[in-house]
Amino acid sequence: YAPVIVDTARKYLAAQNSGRIVKDLTGAKFEDLLREVASNHPVAIWASIDLVDIQEVYAYTIYNYTETNSDGSTSTPKNLDVYWLENEHVYLLKGYDLDRNVVIVNDSLNGEMEYDMNRFKECYEQCYKQAVIIY
């Protein structure tokens, strides 16, 4: 999901001549995200609703799916099962308190919330470490 958000945000901000920078931080260590927050760069981060465990759920099958190879040829058609992450949710990570081991986030479902830092990190990792910043 993050690459699509990054691409769309870059196009929009360029059209607005905003000068803002968009970075895809997917794969970043959680501690690196905290450093961004400490630098006054809130981070959009994928985790799960109410920090429940993520489940991969079968969604549908693409029949006769082919990929285009680097030489322009296509792969042998195959059936591709597509899964999605149940209970996935995006938060805006905007602060943290190491003494209390909590993160402070804006949550579109619950408003400003504090969550246990270790659990939040686990959920971030379950969602393939997806994160985006705009500054």
Locate the predicted segments by residue.
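Cysteine-nucleophile protease catalytic domains, especially the papain-like/related folds used
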Residues: 1-42, 128-135
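Noncatalytic regulatory segments and standalone regulatory/sensor domains
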Residues: 38, 51-53, 57-135
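A short, Trp-centered hydrophobic/proline-enriched beta-strand micro-motif
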Residues: 43-47
